[in-house]
From Swiss-Prot:
Heme binds at residues 229, 249, 283, 285, 319. It holds the Pfam family CRAL_TRIO. Its cofactor is heme b. One of its GO terms (biological process) is Golgi to plasma membrane protein transport. GO terms for cellular component: cortical endoplasmic reticulum; cytosol; endoplasmic reticulum membrane; plasma membrane. This is Phosphatidylinositol transfer protein SFH5. It catalyses: a 1,2-diacyl-sn-glycero-3-phospho-(1D-myo-inositol)(in) = a 1,2-diacyl-sn-glycero-3-phospho-(1D-myo-inositol)(out). The lineage of its organism: Eukaryota, Fungi, Dikarya, Ascomycota, Pezizomycotina. Non-classical phosphatidylinositol (PtdIns) transfer protein (PITP), which exhibits PtdIns-binding/transfer activity in the absence of detectable PtdCho-binding/transfer activity. Regulates PtdIns(4,5)P2 homeostasis at the plasma membrane. Heme-binding protein that may play a role in organic oxidant-induced stress responses. Residues 36-49, 449-460 have a biased composition (Polar residues).
Length: 460
């Protein structure tokens, strides 16, 4: 090797060593070829270094990779720079509400029922109230049992309608018809006035009916009506005028209804539960023996039942028939025709009235004749206003022309009118007529005045 080639070869070896290429063969080459290879090796080393650096970054991302946040803003620089489209956003929200996931299966929201529970849970009662205004207009009357009928927010009104609806087993049409008839009847009869202002014949109705209140530890005040039919002295006189009897009976009933205080109610009756606004009735048939045969009493009884079943529904809690004789079977038969099965179940016949007190926890408060310890009804109970009947005038004496001549008559003209022509012939033979004036202390009266004399006055 010449001296000239040595420096060139040494420089090439140094360049290869600096580039880290240990695989370059140490072979003598032509100077030009060697120089080209050196240049190529240098270029390869320069290219490979960045690739190795990239591989290192891939192998150690947590150490050498730049933070992700640094490259994120370059994703969509144009979109982030634009202002938001408000209309588009609102349209997109509306579309999501209508077409969002699960929108087809989502049930529609029902409006909240703000009505009272007694209406929301009782569609029949709610329907009944919808018809109330029309009923009141047709009847032209709005008072029932002392309650002025208003609307579904008025508790006393609600209780009245519940009673009519229950009496008709939830049938709104029947309840509507009955309420209308009852209102029309009250307008015609004015039962409040019958109870508060009218008076009734004592000779017909004294001792026949009473109203009394007793205290029950659980229920509070219990209202009783008593009908004592054994006190009737003259059946034809008491029951003969059916209208008068019904008015008396209605007056007694209105007294009891007033004691129930329906107009002061503050809580609604439980439609399917107990009703605190009801009374107990007692009918006493002690010594009654006329009800089977007397058609007048049968007529009065049937008409009374008809009126009460229409005008006073659901006011009866229980009804006791005490001292009932066997012949009273027709009464219960009649009741079954006019009243519902629910009402019939409230009836209790008792043969011996003394056993009545056993039916109640307040037995001692009942009169002694019914098994209690209290005074009899005449002293312990109330009744309707009675009036003393004006004594009827005694029958007038018959006119002298039609009557037999009195034995003490001294009026000759009266004798002449009364006697026949044959008796006139014997008139002169009768000395008594001449002596008669001495027996009379009163002055003679004209014959015409004798028609106004009573039998006792004539005898004087």
């Amino acid at each position: 090797m010449s001296e000239t080639e040595k420096p060139v070869q040494a420089a090439a070896a140094a360049a290869v060593a600096a580039a880290g290429t240990a695989d370059v063969p140490a072979v003598e080459k032509d100077p030009e070829t060697t120089q080209d290879k050196q240049q190529s090796a240098t270029d390869n080393s320069t290219t490979k270094a960045p690739q190795d650096e990239k591989n290192k970054q891939t192998e150690n991302p947590s150490t050498d990779a730049p933070p992700a946040a640094a490259t994120a803003p370059t994703a969509d620089p144009i979109t982030s720079a634009q202002p938001p489209d408000v209309d588009a956003i609102e349209a997109q929200k509306d579309g999501q509400k209508k077409n969002g996931p699960g929108s087809e299966n989502k049930p529609d929201e029902t409006p909240v029922d703000t009505r009272p529970e007694y209406l929301s849970k009782n569609p029949a009662l709610s329907e009944f109230f919808e018809k109330l205004a029309s009923i009141l207009k047709k009847a032209d009357h709005n008072e029932m049992w002392g309650v002025t009928l208003k609307d579904s927010d008025d508790v006393p009104t609600v209780n009245v309608l519940i009673k009519f609806l229950r009496a008709n087993e939830g049938n709104v049409k029947l309840a509507e018809e009955q309420l209308r008839k009852a209102l029309e009847w009250r307008k015609k009869m004015n039962p409040l006035a019958l109870a508060e202002k009218a008076t009734y014949s004592s000779s017909k109705f004294q001792g026949l009916g009473y109203v009394a209140n007793y205290k029950d530890q659980n229920q509070g005040k219990v209202v009783f009506t008593w009908n004592i039919y054994g006190s009737v002295k003259d059946a034809n006189r008491t029951f003969g005028d059916v209208d008068e009897f019904i008015k008396w009976r209605v007056a007694l009933m209105e007294m009891a209804v007033k004691d129930l205080k329906l107009s002061e109610a503050t809580s609604v009756i439980d439609y399917s539960g107990e009703d605190p606004y009801q009374m107990i009735q007692v009918h006493d048939y002690q010594n009654v023996s006329f009800l089977r045969l007397n058609p007048t009493i049968k007529s009065a009884t049937k008409q009374t039942i008809d009126v009460f079943s229409t005008a006073y529904p659901e006011l009866l809690k229980e009804k006791f028939f005490v001292n009932v004789p066997a012949l009273m079977g027709w009464v219960f038969t009649a009741l079954k025709v006019f009243l519902s099965k629910n009402t019939i179940r409230k009836f209790h016949p008792i043969t011996n009235g003394v056993n009545l007190a056993r039916e109640f926890s307040f037995a001692d408060e009942l009169p002694k004749s019914y098994g209690g310890k209290a005074d009899e009804l005449a002293e312990s109970a109330r009744t309707v206003a009675l009036r003393q009947d004006t004594p009827e005038p005694p029958p007038e004496s018959a006119p002298p022309a039609q009557a037999s001549p009195p034995t003490t008559e001294t009026n000759g003209s009266a004798k002449e009118v009364a006697k026949t022509a044959a008796e006139d012939a014997k008139k002169a033979e009768a000395p008594v007529a001449a002596d008669a004036p001495a027996t009379i202390s009163e002055p003679e009266k004209p014959a015409a005045s004798s028609a106004n004399e009573t039998p006792s006055e004539v005898a004087k």
